[in-house]
Amino acid sequence: MKKVIITPSKLRGSVKIPPSKSMAHRAIICASLSKGESVISNIDFSEDIIATMEGMKSLGANIKVEKDKLIINGENILKDSNYKFIDCNESGSTLRFLVPISLIKDNRVNFIGRGNLGKRPLKTYYEIFEEQEIKYSYEEENLDLNIEGSLKGGEFKVKGNISSQFISGLLFTLPLLKDDSKIIITTELESKGYIDLTLDMIEKFGVTIKNNNYREFLIKGNQSYKPMNYKVEGDYSQAAFYFSAGALGSEINCLDLDLSSYQGDKECIEILEGMGARLIESQERSLSIIHGDLNGTIIDASQCPDIIPVLTVVAALSKGETRIINGERLRIKECDRLNAICTELNKLGADIKELKDGLIINGVKDLIGGEVYSHKDHRIAMSLAIASTRCKKEVIIKEPDCVKKSYPGFWEDFKSLGGILREE
């Protein structure tokens, strides 16, 4: 569909939160690196997850789909040295996780992608390639990366203010190399929550890594992943949309969430509570955010960049000023998210000023409505849908199908909660 036209209304009801995309990526990778059969259940087949599945299959994993389950056997992973082709689509996780994994043994691999993926930085890996004499060539505009060689253990110095996906990619890979390795983080580490997810998943599959206060990671070589069965928990980055709607006056019960989760995006609860909303735990794995007298705050984007667009919606409708800080990495996501959410919410009647690494948001009582553009970014599209619940007039969102990247059932769930929309 080319656009959705939403008539403003409050959302009410219960919604099963989709499985965590971040955890599904990690479980699929660890299972594919295990010698034996694993069953990964509660999978949502978004475009990003399909990209990782197909990528691991290209590297030799046997993956079968049974409804919402994956049966994965990694007995033949990287057993041959044939030329390998991996289509990452628009998934930065697939690309940055699988690049080092593909080099566990001597290989020739071609990675391609679409959309903004070619513009997302890979300099961290290029520096490693050059240091280890791994051949590579790269076309930026449309991702086309060719690499040839194998990765060796040793010392890896990585900046902490880059995407945590680089560090996770190395954490998956280095335990399988012959020699011991050390990852040294040279600046303050951002997105620690995503590193915690990786370390937790790796440990579940039998691999040990010593974490020295996120300053360095000590990794013994010659380890092996052990197969296991794993159920993917609900995704806090998707729940954040409904939590935000709740903070703005909707009444939504979010099902299948684990309050003890390591997911960094769980921080959305603390941020919304700090602004004046209230968390209700009605039963086990069932959470709601209740509307309160919302006030502006300071939100540090460095540890939870994915939930910043929808938190900007909440801030736009809160009293006083909110500042988004340390958000420069949002400019190199599926789109420039700082610019996109600022531009589109201002079209709806918000008062937002864009800074180099953040936003200044002056709250308004209500938004007006109008025509906006998703920038073909799933999180921008869903954030604008939540904004519509506090608009006075219709909201028209162009290019809404981009939600398939992470949450294919979003528009159906939106309607099931009472959202009034028509497609064109």
From Swiss-Prot:
- EC annotation from Swiss-Prot or TrEMBL: 2.5.1.19
Which protein is depicted? 3-phosphoshikimate 1-carboxyvinyltransferase
Name the gene for this chain. Answer: aroA
- Tell me which Gene Ontology terms the entry assigns under biological process: amino acid biosynthetic process; aromatic amino acid family biosynthetic process; chorismate biosynthetic process
Which Gene Ontology cellular component terms are annotated?
A: cytoplasm
Residue ranges annotated as coiled coil are: none
The job of this chain, per UniProt, is described as: Catalyzes the transfer of the enolpyruvyl moiety of phosphoenolpyruvate (PEP) to the 5-hydroxyl of shikimate-3-phosphate (S3P) to produce enolpyruvyl shikimate-3-phosphate and inorganic phosphate.
Which pathway does this polypeptide act in? Metabolic intermediate biosynthesis; chorismate biosynthesis; chorismate from D-erythrose 4-phosphate and phosphoenolpyruvate: step 6/7
Q: Which family does it belong to?
A: Belongs to the EPSP synthase family.
* Primary location: cytoplasm
Instruction: Spell out the molecular function terms from Gene Ontology.
Output: 3-phosphoshikimate 1-carboxyvinyltransferase activity
Where does the protein end up? Answer: Cytoplasm
| Residues the entry annotates as binding phosphoenolpyruvate | K21, G92, R120, Q165, R337, R379, K405
Q: Which InterPro entries match?
A: Enolpyruvate_Tfrase_dom, Enolpyruvate_Tfrase_sf, EPSP_synthase, EPSP_synthase_CS, RNA3'P_cycl/enolpyr_Trfase_a/b
Q: Which Gene3D superfamilies match?
A: Enolpyruvate transferase domain
Q: State the organism named in the record.
A: Clostridium perfringens (strain 13 / Type A)
Q: Which UniProt keywords apply?
A: Amino-acid biosynthesis, Aromatic amino acid biosynthesis, Cytoplasm, Transferase
Catalysed conversion reaction: 3-phosphoshikimate + phosphoenolpyruvate = 5-O-(1-carboxyvinyl)-3-phosphoshikimate + phosphate
Q: Which PANTHER family match?
A: AROM/DEHYDROQUINATE SYNTHASE (PTHR21090), PENTAFUNCTIONAL AROM POLYPEPTIDE (PTHR21090:SF5)
Subunit details:
Monomer.
Query: EC top class, in one word?
Result: transferase
Instruction: Report the active site residues.
Output: D306
**Amino-acid positions noted as binding 3-phosphoshikimate in the UniProt annotation, renumbered to this chain:** K21, S22, R26, S163, S164, Q165, S191, D306, K333
CDD domains named among the record's database cross-references: EPSP_synthase
The source's domain of life comes to Bacteria
